[in-house]
Amino acid sequence: MSIEVRGLSKRFGAFRALDEVSLHIETGELVALLGPSGCGKTTLLRIIAGLESADAGSVLFAGEDATDVDVRQRQVGFVFQHYALFKHMTVFENVAFGLRVRHRSQRPSEARIRAKVLDLLGLVQLDWLADRYPAQLSGGQRQRIALARALAVEPRVLLLDEPFGALDAKVRKELRRWLRRLHDELHVASVFVTHDQEEALEVADRVVLMNAGRIEQVGSPREVWERPATPFVYGFLGDVNQLHGHATRGVWRLGEVALPAPDLPEADNQRAIAYVRPHDIDLARAGTAAPGIPVRLNHVYLAGPSAYLELARQDDQAIIEAQVPEPLFRSLGLKEGEALLAQPRRARVFAVQP
């Protein structure tokens, strides 16, 4: 079942949580709502679920208006960050809960409930824990049980609010791969909220970047990473250097450094910022003929196959971060305190708004 929101707006007092947000999610699609705290992503998820009401706009499921439909009638599965499992119930009873509290006319028989629960526990690979209590489970196991409980009522859509946020890094990585595989089996429209860039880029079919109650960009993980639409998206997704210069007729300049600025073909000495990833910066020793930004090597740390360099510009001491392959770093024989030239190889240039 598809999900569509049209012109959603929501305020909490003077705070604007959502500002005319519109989005369409296809059946079977796994979409990540990604952004910093306070950007509106959880509010949007809760309005889709029916846990919050919008001040304006509408929510549609499969093309039908569900804006005023009660949360109990929306057939939405919701997974919270902190599991919300019933401590006094076993794993089996937790998963069966949504089925057992249905109205008598819709409630399955106990035999069907048992079969359904055991099927779901098998799906999340935890059928051997059916008789245990939540306190006897690890964090990753609890989250999988919470997901099984959400699926028990056969939701038309699945919503997850930072489902792995309370788990350690290794468990998060394992569970998000598992969620991707599980989603491919279920083929329902699923939306999950996260502030973890790696999580969104690894798991989702599409990523929705949100900022200050608005959508900045929607696209596949590859699209938003390789072609950020706005300075916010560029700055939010991964590490980036911001180099302030000027653009004229499609060329950005800072001192002797010149880079293409195809988005600014009509610029005339306009202030502009070049966004440069650390791995897109080459290094040369000071005194070479090649153009570059004069810097001094402040600090180096090695992590796996890469060397990460902190460079201080010699004009204003602003920091530039560079990332080079560890073998290349060793072959260059660079030393902390050495004068170098930072040479941006590739950048995306945005005009500074007046």
From Swiss-Prot:
Residues 3-237 form the ABC transporter domain. Signal peptide: none annotated. It catalyses: sulfate(out) + ATP + H2O = sulfate(in) + ADP + phosphate + H(+); thiosulfate(out) + ATP + H2O = thiosulfate(in) + ADP + phosphate + H(+). It is found in: Cell inner membrane. Keywords: ATP-binding, Cell inner membrane, Cell membrane, Membrane, Nucleotide-binding, Sulfate transport, Translocase, Transport. InterPro entries: AAA+_ATPase, ABC_SmlMolc_Importer, ABC_transporter-like_ATP-bd, ABC_transporter-like_CS, CysA_C, Mo/tungstate-bd_C_term_dom, P-loop_NTPase, Sulph_transpt1. It is a peripheral membrane protein. Belongs to the ABC transporter superfamily. Sulfate/tungstate importer (TC 3.A.1.6) family. This is Sulfate/thiosulfate import ATP-binding protein CysA.
